[in-house]
């Protein structure tokens, strides 16, 4: 696993666990990491956990004017007209296409304090929510200055990039992330119909180039969430086999190359995850 990641030019902290047993593998699993868009897992879990407790209605419609939307390359972030969507449909966009604008509407309705309370209740002591995605984008733009975001990828750049520093924003660990996923899949994070809805939403991600690339089988289901920001390439999710066994996976990586397009690095995450799951399956 380490050889695969190293040859692809990735530094990684990762953790893989059997959802229903004690078997686990990892390296640097307790190191704090800047989670980028993987943090949307914690956000949508808090939404549906609040729904299960009767404190929020995910079917409630929200008016979404164009002004004030957070920047991004997908979903509402690139739409040019006003819209009206429910909170659960916004959650679907936040997971399926990593829509930053949709996620920030959820932050506004669920609340940063509520997400932090949720992860504390679930025992995730090293996970902290500290900023909306619009604030994250603004910090990148401020750090880049006139050179633009591309300047931040230059290995020789002396600029401190706050978005890459776990202490500056949303953060977690690989072990906390797999713990969250295991609790979600066991129905411990959110029970009942809203727990089923949470599982449905987390199975909607469209990207297949990282975690899912390591499991190209029609009878193996992969649910996940990517995170991409400058040199960061993350993915976390659950791999479910037809024999009923299931595995929570979290890979937080940083590329050594400044290139934005690195398909070999992306696929290495899937390959390493497959090797880890195969080892747990014996």
What are these regions (language model features)?
Residues 1-29, 240:
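A short, well-structured edge-of-sheet supersecondary motif
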Residues 69-106, 112:
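Conserved catalytic neighborhood of penicillin-recognizing serine enzymes
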């Amino acid at each position: 696993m380490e050889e695969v990641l190293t040859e692809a030019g990735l530094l990684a902290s990762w953790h893989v666990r059997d959802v229903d047993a004690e078997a686990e593998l990892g390296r640097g699993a307790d190191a704090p990491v800047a989670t980028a868009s993987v943090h949307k897992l914690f956000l949508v879990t808090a939404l549906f956990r609040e729904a299960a407790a009767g404190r929020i209605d995910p079917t409630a419609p929200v008016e979404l004017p164009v002004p004030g939307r957070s920047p991004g390359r997908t979903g509402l972030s690139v739409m040019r007209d006003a819209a009206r969507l429910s909170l659960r449909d916004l959650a679907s966009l936040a997971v399926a296409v990593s829509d930053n604008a949709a996620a920030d509407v959820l932050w506004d309705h669920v609340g940063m304090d509520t997400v932090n309370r949720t992860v504390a209740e679930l025992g995730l002591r090293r996970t902290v929510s500290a900023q909306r995605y619009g604030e994250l984008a603004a910090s990148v733009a401020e750090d880049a200055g006139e050179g633009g975001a591309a300047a931040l990828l230059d290995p020789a750049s002396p600029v401190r990039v706050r978005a890459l520093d776990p202490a500056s924003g949303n953060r977690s660990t690989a072990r906390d992330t797999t713990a969250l996923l295991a609790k979600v899949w066991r129905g411990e994070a959110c029970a009942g119909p809203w727990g089923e809805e949470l599982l449905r939403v987390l199975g909607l991600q469209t990207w297949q180039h990282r975690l899912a690339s390591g499991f190209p089988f029609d009878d193996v289901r992969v649910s996940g969430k990517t995170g991409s920001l400058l040199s960061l390439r993350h993915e976390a999710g659950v791999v479910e086999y037809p024999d009923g066994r299931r595995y929570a996976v979290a890979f937080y990586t940083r590329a050594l190359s400044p290139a934005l397009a690195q398909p070999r690095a992306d696929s290495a995450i899937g390959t390493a995850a497959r090797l880890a799951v195969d080892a747990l399956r014996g």
